[in-house]
Amino acid sequence: MTKKIIFSTGGTGGHIFPAINLMKHFFDKGYKVLLVTDIRGNNFVKNYSEFKSYVLKAETPTNKNLFKKFLSFLVIFNSIIKSIIILKKEKPDLIFGFGGYVSFPISFVSKFFNLPLIIYENNMVLGRANRYLSLFSKKILVAKNISINFPEKYKGKTYEVGSILDKKIINYSISKKNNNKENFSILILGGSQGAEIFGTIVPPVIKMINNEGYKIEIIQQCIMSQKISIVNFYKKNNIKNYVFEFDKNILELILSSNLAITRCGASTTAELVHTLTPFIAVPLPNSVDNHQYLNAKYYQNNGCCWILGQNNFNTENLFNLIMETIKNKNKLENIRENMKKNYNKNVYKDIENEIKEFI
């Protein structure tokens, strides 16, 4: 009889993309896979006809006044009822949670159906939903060994498996990376929401570098309202550019880059490390539990990146840091060597081994 796994996840890129990657893996292995997410996450899987999905609502009850907390709990309660209906209908063999508040209801309800729950944490600190779910999960799988605010009592069921990236990234050949192009290519990644500050600070810095006589090619993600002005700026200054809001062929963009300037979502930084792309990390200052800074700090401690805090993210500091990387090719090569020590190409096999006793 074919085994069935329900994957539950929040709808942000850092949650939904690892979930989709693992769903594709188990689907190819012959499992039935279903997704429970919010409307944002559901938009990402519309093109996957093989995946059945359910949309739930969920809100965080934290940092709200009493009335809004009450409304949030009503939303969560309604999603718990819907989760009971889903589990009775689908009769899965395993629940696999990726965090985000929408993952909480069905993961919580799984306890009362005696279903094994596995949770996965992509960041260097346990997210709030995963923190609650850790209590009754069978195993906690983590991308990296978490030591920050991690409950000691859960360490016995915690296993490091690595980042669940697209297999094209995990399996790509390092020889495809072209670090000797005529133009020095810089990739700007603002995360799933874009980053307005990148659109303000980066273009004048690229102009300054271009004026120094260096041939620069810029590949820049931006928010929609900035796109026309950024494109016109680069065109006016004769700077080769590709400016985009979203591009599904992100691997090709990464592979064509010598350096990245990026927010610090766990998946994005892991993709850069797997493709040996040195990066300047600019953590989102208001990320939940400061997880973006902690993600970046892990890689900085392992010699894989530079950190430039948003308070210090100005044209002078960014110009000096980029110029340092352009002039010192040995430093870039040292970072690439460090990156080779900081990824796991066997993540899918390791996950299979960790869950096989439950399915």
PLM ranges: what are they?
Residues 4, 32, 40, 51, ...:
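Active-site-proximal region of nucleotide-activated glycan assembly enzymes
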Residues 4-10, 27-75, 161, 190, ...:
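Conserved nucleotide-sugar phosphate-binding/catalytic loop shared by glycosyltransferases and other
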Residues 24, 36, 41-49, 173-260, ...:
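Donor-nucleotide binding loops and adjacent catalytic segments primarily
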Residues 65-94, 112:
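An amphipathic, basic-hydrophobic alpha-helix
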Residues 92-94, 239, 255-270, 277-278:
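Acidic donor-binding loop of glycosyltransferase active sites
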Residues 302, 306-309, 313-330:
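C-terminal "capping" alpha-helix adjacent to the active site of nucleotide-linked donor transferases
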Residues 331-345:
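A short, well-ordered alpha-helix in the C-terminal region of glycosyltransferases
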Residues 344-359:
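C-terminal alpha-helical cap of glycosyltransferases
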